[in-house]
Regions:
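Short S/T/G/P-rich N-terminal loop/turn motif that feeds into the first structured element of a domain
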Residues: 1-228
Length: 228
């Protein structure tokens, strides 16, 4: 298919109440063209398969620097995901990190779909550190004037089931809004919050554009709302 531009849908419904588990998979690629091919391969594998009822939605992204593909899959039944992906072929079989949504913060609303998603991850020493770093970052956001994070629509914090990771999926109005945030005071406050928390090691962040969105519930009823 060769698509190299993001699609229009709003991305995953991060706060949907029936999503009991989230599975995140990353692939590292040499360049944007390879990333686009991999995106298409994995999304096509999901579309061609017969997903179990326990899976809800699949969203695939490419980083703006073109070196990372990220898939974000939501499941009603946490036990349904791994047997399904192991039945697929090629890159779609890759093992994910399993998360639970711990907290969501909505900072602004927009009539337009988000322009990008920024995914930040942290390596942490157990469940208590997971909760501590989430509270620290949320506190930094809550304490900042709105003009210091203009363009940030929401931040949704996920904790890995093995206690080793925290993932923040943040939605932004545009790449430019996120770039402005990186130069501002709130960004510095969040860095201080993460750096001052023992047992927490920031891994970094990537900015992504959405390329594929598959609503598995609609696919099963014959009303496929997938986009590519």
């Amino acid at each position: 298919m060769g698509r190299d531009t993001p699609v229009a849908p709003a991305g995953p419904d991060l706060g949907r109440p029936d999503a009991r588990a989230v599975f995140v998979t990353q692939w590292y690629v040499p360049d944007r063209a390879a990333g686009t091919r991999l995106l298409d391969e994995v999304a096509d594998a999901w579309r061609a398969a017969d997903p179990p009822d326990g899976l809800l939605a699949f969203h695939a992204h490419l980083s703006t620097d073109g070196d990372t593909v990220l898939a974000y899959a939501q499941a009603r039944d946490p036990d349904a995901y791994r047997p399904f992906v192991r039945s697929l072929r090629g890159a779609a079989r890759a093992e994910p990190v399993e998360y639970r949504l711990r907290r969501g913060v909505v900072l602004a609303s927009s009539a337009r779909p988000p322009g990008c998603a920024v995914v930040a991850t942290f390596d942490v020493d157990g469940a208590e550190r997971q909760d501590r770093i989430i509270e620290s970052v949320v506190g930094a956001l809550d304490g900042a004037p709105a003009d210091q994070h203009r363009g940030m629509l929401s931040a949704h914090f996920h904790t890995s089931t093995d206690g080793s990771r925290v993932l923040n999926y943040a939605r932004w109005t545009s790449d430019e809004a996120h770039e402005a945030f990186l130069a501002g005071a709130t960004r510095r406050a969040t860095l201080r919050a993460t750096g001052a928390t023992p047992g927490v090691r920031p891994i970094g962040f990537k900015r992504y554009h959405l390329h594929h969105a598959i609503d598995l519930g609609r696919s099963r009823t014959g009303r496929d709302r997938s986009t590519s």
